Amino acid sequence: MLKNVNRLILSICLVIVSACTTNDLEPTLANRITMVTSGDVSLVSKTYAWHQTMFSVHTKNTQDEEPLRELLRQSVNKVMAAKGYQQVAYTDSPQMLIGFGMALESEMSDTEILAKAGLVPGLSTHGVDKKLEKGSVLIAFFNPLVKEPYWRVLAQGFTEHNKSVDKRAAGFDALSKMMLSAIPSS
């Protein structure tokens, strides 16, 4: 009798457990981002200015390049101000310079990015919908007296290349916040 009760309980447990299913929640491709950083954030200083020559943007539509440049500058400025850093003019002898680069995969390959930046996150495009394109954003911090950056971060994600520039502001803010999360508050 006890064996029959144990078998019944075991059978019920097996039915209950086998009825349970799990779903892996994968982020949508549009939200997938990979990042790689290199350098020493302890060298970050209180005042900064924008690098005079490192601000390149490579897109399919050259008319979007200046608005995208300005969007990224604004987003980085917001993050840096929230962390207590002060932007100054280049002529006011900033303690550090911030530069950036941005490119779509159709305009610059991972091999080219690696050659220029020395970093590449290697986000795979296998099986990605053709309406999305891989984009890369590099942010680098420099000592004004040294040519090479002392800290840099490179992020890759997917973007809808047909999306208007004005609809990308929130995405730039979120990306800048994520990319600069390692920068300590001043």
Task: Name these PLM-found stretches.
Residues 21-39, 129-136, 141-186:
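C-terminal/domain-edge helix-coil "capping" segments
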Residues 38-46, 87-94, 141-148:
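A short, structured loop/turn motif at beta-sheet edges
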Residues 42, 60-72, 90, 129-133, ...:
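Extracytoplasmic/periplasmic, Sec-exported soluble proteins
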Residues 16-19:
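C-terminal motif of bacterial Sec signal peptides marking the signal peptidase cleavage site
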Residues 1-9:
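Bacterial N-terminal signal peptides that target proteins for export
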Residues 93-150, 156:
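Surface-exposed short loop/turn segments
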Residues 28-56:
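Compositionally biased P/S/T/G-rich terminal and signal peptide-adjacent segments
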Residues 47-105:
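N-terminal segment of the mature soluble domain
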